[in-house]
Amino acid sequence: MNKNTLQKDTNGAATELGYIFTFLLGVMLLSMFSMWAWDIETATRERWNEQAIQANLDDIAAAVERADEASRMGDVQYSESVYWRATEADENQFILSLTNEQLILEDSAGSLDLEVSISGAGSGQHSGSVQLSGISTIWIVHSEGVTSIQLERPQ
């Protein structure tokens, strides 16, 4: 004789709940890992961006120093092009200014304002201000006793 009786079996439900909790734990761990990896990538990109901008300013300051050295030779004209390394910053907001003591980068957004000191040991004045929107080359020019920065190649 074959008797069919229903039995209350909770083992299957416990297994299903275990699958669900394991899945949710995996989703949570992957989400945390994704946020951690994104944070590392963002911090690295920002650091590289700041280092590229600082290297650009250092290159321009070195070119200004070379123009000052040429100005001490007498009535000479000197020009040098400096390549502006590409950055991820919004360079439409950047204004680069040259004074007698400093090379100043002004960022309208305010997060990347930088200054590089220069010796000012040339025989003339320093002047110039350029907007860095879409440029790849900056010219350092010493002519008629003035060292300046400009975007156009001198004639």
What are these regions (language model features)?
Residues 2, 25, 151-155:
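A broadly tuned preference for mixed-charge, low-complexity surface segments
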Residues 15, 19-44:
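C-terminal juxtamembrane segment of a hydrophobic transmembrane alpha-helix
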Residues 11, 28-30, 131:
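Alpha-helical protein-protein interaction elements
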Residues 35-155:
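N-terminal export/assembly leader peptides and their processing motifs that target proteins to secretory
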Residues 1-13:
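N-terminal leader/signal peptides at the extreme start of proteins
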Residues 5-7, 18, 68, 92:
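Broad hydrophobic/π-residue packing in well-ordered secondary structure
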